[in-house]
């Protein structure tokens, strides 16, 4: 009698897995961003260091600290991938200077939490300073740059990242403006190529009830995981709001979004600034974790490219994909360290295979939700509908120009603005 219920449970579970697999990227992302999936995932992630420590205490294995540090690095890159996914995957902006905000946050915290300029702010004040500084730089770059489109925006943001690196390297001595030295002879703001050392960690309890003493490496792993959970929560809340829908509309078709009255500049700037502040806070946590702020890799273009690969690997606009991309691009290099000559070959082969077999990313690109038809059923945009649309009469250049002019007139009308 007991075999039949067990068999039915197995059949139901296999049916659920089959439905999950056939639901496609949209179904995968919806399923993986539900609370009943995310809450156990983050609770399990918080428990991983404790499990590693338990295994180390009860065996001859001694890798708990090493693997916790690897997972902390993975969580840090997952935070950066989620932040970049906001501006690239949601709003469709190609920000090649993204990692510069990570470096700005790192240096901003180091300056107010070290002896470099003899300032030691409390944690809440340091978070406020880092947020304001990164926001100021984001507005300084974003206000003029976001009026550009496509490749021009990418070029401007790339130039910003390169300029910030040079500025950090040169501020180990008093700057010279218009032939005059600004500041005393001994002025050293950023430490140049050496960076800023002896950055104080966060003033947090070193012991917790029921857990006892908490090592430094474990505490910062938990901080990264907690900040990642916070970013995921707010991103999911934003996605279903007017702001989130405006971002996706701008990404998919900016001209159509403008024609519908969306203030595209405002929403593009909001995505750009929010992503920058998130990256700055991640840089702050990193500086407190390693007690230093360095110009490399904090301002390296290679780091931006690596985070871009994580986002594209997981799927544009996919939050679980950003986490999966960070794991897939961070953990394997550590596993292949003993095969140093083959490490990058294996990683390259894996990336090429993903590009060939999953060009939209491991979890696919997230698009606008299915639309509702007059009959009340959900209609998906499929290849068949694209074929039907291709059979319609072609639109001439004159008609396109008329539409653009009409769209500009609508946007200028304040009654049509959101």
Q: What are these model-derived regions, one by one?
A:
Residues 2-418:
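Transmembrane alpha-helices and adjacent helix-loop boundaries
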């Amino acid at each position: 009698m007991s075999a039949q219920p067990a068999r039915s449970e197995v059949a139901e579970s296999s049916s659920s897995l089959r439905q999950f697999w056939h639901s496609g990227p949209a179904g995968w992302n919806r399923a993986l961003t539900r609370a009943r999936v995310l809450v156990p995932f983050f609770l399990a992630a918080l428990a991983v260091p404790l499990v590693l420590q338990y295994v180390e205490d009860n065996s001859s294995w001694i890798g708990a600290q090493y693997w916790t540090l690897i997972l902390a690095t993975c969580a840090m890159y997952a935070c950066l991938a989620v932040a970049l996914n906001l501006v690239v995957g949601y709003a469709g902006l190609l920000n090649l200077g993204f990692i510069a905000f990570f470096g700005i946050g790192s240096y901003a915290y180091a300056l107010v939490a070290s002896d470099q300029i003899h300032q030691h702010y409390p944690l809440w004040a340091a978070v406020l300073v880092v947020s304001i500084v990164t926001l100021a730089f984001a507005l300084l770059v974003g206000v003029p740059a976001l009026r550009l489109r496509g490749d021009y925006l990418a070029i401007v943001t790339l130039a910003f990242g390169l300029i910030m690196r040079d500025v950090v390297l040169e501020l180990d001595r008093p700057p010279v403006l218009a032939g005059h030295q600004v500041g005393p002879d001994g002025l050293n703001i950023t430490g140049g190529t050496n960076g800023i050392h002896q950055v104080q960690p966060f003033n947090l309890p070193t012991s917790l009830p029921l857990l006892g003493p908490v090592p430094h490496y474990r505490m910062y792993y938990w901080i990264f995981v907690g900040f990642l959970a916070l970013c995921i929560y707010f991103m999911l809340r934003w996605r279903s709001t007017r702001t989130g829908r405006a971002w996706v509309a701008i990404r998919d078709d900016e001209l159509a979004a403008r024609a519908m009255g969306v203030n595209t500049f405002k929403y593009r700037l909001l995505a750009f600034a929010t992503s920058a502040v998130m990256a700055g806070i991640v840089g702050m946590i990193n500086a407190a974790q390693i007690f230093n702020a360095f110009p490399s890799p904090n301002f390296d273009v290679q780091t931006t490219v690596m985070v871009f690969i994580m986002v594209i690997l997981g799927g544009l606009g996919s939050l679980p994909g950003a986490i999966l991309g960070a794991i897939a691009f961070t953990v394997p290099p550590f596993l292949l360290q003993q095969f140093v000559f083959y490490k990058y070959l294996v990683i390259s082969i894996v990336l090429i295979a993903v590009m060939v077999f999953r060009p939209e990313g491991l979890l696919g690109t997230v698009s606008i939700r299915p639309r509702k038809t007059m009959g009340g059923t959900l209609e998906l945009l499929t290849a068949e509908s694209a074929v039907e649309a291709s059979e319609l009469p072609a639109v001439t250049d004159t008609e396109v120009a008329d539409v653009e002019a009409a769209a500009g007139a609508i946007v200028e009308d304040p009654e049509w603005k959101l």
